[in-house]
């Protein structure tokens, strides 16, 4: 038995200079797992609660000492003596201890950090890599794949201070034969884009996730400049590389309208879907995330109707990694993919349940970071261990993003042909 003998919580810093929760789980025999909770910038209203102290005299109210105290007291007491390999049981103990719908008593940041640390400790106890342990927890032992990265190379919206409304413009190196090759392609495009921006006299500073944030006139301009960079890097757009968007539309949804302040345009629900379709008709956009507000279910039905057969429509704020909400989406034919973020739901077990539900319904699952990250690279192991097929973990700079890519390189080296890179076949509507 992988007996838990100690649980330790502490306050550490995330990539935006805000505090977050880190946890350690110690087992008999000296096995230790350590993990940290990430934090989002654009968040869905139905996400599990990230518990902050609210003490304005410390970190402007963003301290997490209360959540850390919950780890060191209530959670520790509840888990001492338990078996770390029994992940579902551990997570249920913490969920029951919290007793609220959205984990607002203990904090999803506290529960998640311990949940992931326990999984890492259990993997160490079993003498196997974390991705292998996750595959076993998922009921799919030995079934792996390397994910196609969605590389966020140009930022707008909440992730940048510019006139671009769409939050993320991403490249997907679908023409690569291996993850290592895909990463190289993305890096070459990233550096070429920097030169293109510099030569045009545009800013080459980067946003929270490492993408550039130039002040462009429109969203179409952002796509045009990425196209230029892809081709200058020696790749063919639409064959070697496809494009993906994260609109984060809830951030500019006001009074039932989609207000693109940067472009000076206002759309109704169907009008904004038509606008996105027009962009996808001009460029090889194969994936659109949060193309409408999380509450605009009628609009989502229309968007799925006009684009769902050819384009991956990803629900992030829409589904918040929550099986109850995803069930409603599946029943109503809303979207065809779910973004998976650990901290939206707050435990590894619930995260795996959302991935399984999506796959069983024919939806894809895209594993994702948050804008506030740490050096923790658990999502890399999650992507491989569930054979999710896609990962979204930022651009090709900032150590908090590159940590995940580097872990994927290590995993691919270990697994070789046991973890194929399937490229375009992983993306809904493209197989």
From Swiss-Prot:
Which family is it part of?
Belongs to the enolase family.
Which PANTHER family does the record cross-reference, listed alphabetically?
ENOLASE (PTHR11902:SF1)
Task: Name the predominant localization.
Answer: cytoplasm
What functional role does this protein have? Answer: Catalyzes the reversible conversion of 2-phosphoglycerate (2-PG) into phosphoenolpyruvate (PEP). It is essential for the degradation of carbohydrates via glycolysis.
Residues binding (2R)-2-phosphoglycerate, per UniProt? 167, 341, 370-371, 392
Binding-site residues for Mg(2+), renumbered to this chain: 246, 289, 316
Task: Provide the species name.
Answer: Shewanella baltica (strain OS155 / ATCC BAA-1091)
Q: What class of enzyme is it?
A: lyase
Gene Ontology molecular function: magnesium ion binding; phosphopyruvate hydratase activity
Which cellular component, as a GO term, is one annotated location?
extracellular region
Binding note for cofactor: Binds a second Mg(2+) ion via substrate during catalysis.
Designated name of the protein = Enolase
Question: What gene is it encoded by?
Answer: eno
Q: Enumerate the Gene3D superfamilies for this protein.
A: Enolase-like C-terminal domain, Enolase-like, N-terminal domain
Reactions listed under catalytic activity: (2R)-2-phosphoglycerate = phosphoenolpyruvate + H2O
Keyword Acetylation tagged: no
Cofactor field: Mg(2+)
Which InterPro entries does the record associate with it? Enolase, Enolase-like_C_sf, Enolase-like_N, Enolase_C, Enolase_CS, Enolase_N
What GO biological process terms are annotated to this protein in UniProt?
glycolytic process
Q: How does it assemble?
A: Component of the RNA degradosome, a multiprotein complex involved in RNA processing and mRNA degradation.
So what EC number does this one have? 4.2.1.11
Keyword Flavoprotein (UniProt):
no
């Amino acid at each position: 038995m992988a007996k838990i003998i100690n649980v330790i919580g502490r306050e550490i810093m995330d990539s935006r200079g805000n505090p977050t929760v880190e946890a350690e789980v110690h087992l008999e025999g000296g096995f230790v797992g350590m993990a940290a909770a990430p934090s989002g910038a654009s968040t869905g209203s139905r996400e599990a609660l990230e518990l902050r102290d609210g003490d304005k005299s410390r970190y402007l109210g963003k301290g997490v000492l209360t959540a850390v105290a919950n780890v060191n007291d209530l959670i520790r007491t509840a888990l001492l003596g338990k078996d770390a390999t029994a992940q579902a049981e551990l997570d249920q103990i913490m969920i029951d201890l919290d007793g609220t719908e959205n984990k607002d008593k203990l904090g999803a940041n506290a529960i998640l950090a311990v949940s992931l640390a326990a999984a890492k400790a259990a993997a160490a106890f079993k003498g196997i890599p974390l991705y292998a342990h996750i595959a076993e927890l998922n009921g799919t032992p030995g079934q792996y794949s390397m994910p196609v990265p969605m590389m966020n190379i140009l930022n707008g919206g909440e992730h940048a201070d510019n006139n671009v409304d769409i939050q993320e413009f991403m490249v997907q190196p679908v023409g690569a034969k291996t993850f290592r090759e895909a990463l190289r392609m993305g890096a070459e495009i990233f550096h070429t884009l920097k030169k293109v921006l510099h030569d045009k006299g545009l800013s080459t500073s980067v946003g929270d996730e490492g993408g550039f944030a130039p002040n462009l006139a429109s969203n179409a301009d952002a796509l045009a400049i990425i196209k230029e960079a892809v081709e200058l890097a020696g790749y063919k757009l639409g064959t070697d590389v496809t494009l993906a968007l994260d609109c984060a539309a809830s951030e500019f949804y006001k009074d039932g309208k989609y207000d693109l302040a940067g472009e000076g345009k206002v759309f109704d629900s169907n009008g904004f879907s038509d606008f996105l379709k027009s962009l996808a008709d001009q460029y090889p956009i194969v994936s659109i995330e949060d193309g409408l507000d999380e509450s605009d279910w009628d609009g989502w039905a229309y968007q799925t109707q006009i684009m769902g057969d050819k384009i991956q429509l990803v629900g992030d704020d829409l589904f918040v990694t929550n099986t109850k909400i995803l069930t409603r989406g599946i029943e109503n034919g809303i979207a065809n993919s779910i973004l998976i973020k650990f901290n939206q739901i707050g435990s590894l077990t619930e995260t795996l349940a959302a991935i399984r539900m999506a796959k069983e319904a024919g939806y894809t699952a895209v594993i994702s970071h948050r804008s506030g990250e740490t050096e923790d690279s658990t999502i890399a192991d999650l992507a491989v261990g569930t054979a999710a097929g896609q990962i979204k973990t930022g651009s090709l700079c900032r150590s908090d993003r590159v940590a995940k890519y580097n872990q994927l390189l290590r995993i691919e080296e270990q697994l070789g042909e046991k973890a194929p890179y399937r490229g375009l076949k992983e993306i809904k509507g493209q197989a």
